[in-house]
Amino acid sequence: MNILHVLSGDFVAGSETSTAAVIDYQIKLGHQVWIASGQFTHATQARVVPIPIYDRGLLRRFLNIRELTQIIRRENIHIVHAHSRAASWVSYWACRFTHTAYLSTLHGRQHLHFSNKWFNVYGPQCAAVCENIRDQMLEETRVFEPEQLVVIRNGIETKASH
């Protein structure tokens, strides 16, 4: 399977660390993996495509959608996995234009505003890394039914690879 992970990439966070562990496992299983991110500091065998997803300016968002659309088509991506609000926003539109499967993981409590309270840019299925985040989205937004939002905890690699 060809998988594209999309992250904001404006600073190192837990989402990058846990995504790196997921990517390593996906590659170990034989999947082809790409990362679109402003920066990705963890060593990885995935192909990293630098795109300033963190830049939320309107023009930049349209350019990011175009760049993601090009990657999805060029690399025959089967699924896009977004890991931040900004990543979810641009991934949602790129996947709509390309008819590509899509999901998001919510790694932290969401800063809610009109658009993400009433408009689901996170995809038809979404993972939250803990019950607190899942509960926030179910209680404070109108975008999810309970069965659309599952808790999947971040995995960690316990064996050091030195």
What are the residue ranges of the model-derived segments?
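Glycine-rich phosphate-binding loop signature in dinucleotide/nucleotide-binding domains
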Residues: 71-78
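A conserved, positively charged/aromatic
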Residues: 96-131, 143-144
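Carbohydrate-associated surface elements
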Residues: 132, 155
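Short His-centered aromatic/hydrophobic patch
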Residues: 61, 82-88, 106
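Short beta-strand scaffold positions
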Residues: 35-37, 81-82, 128-129
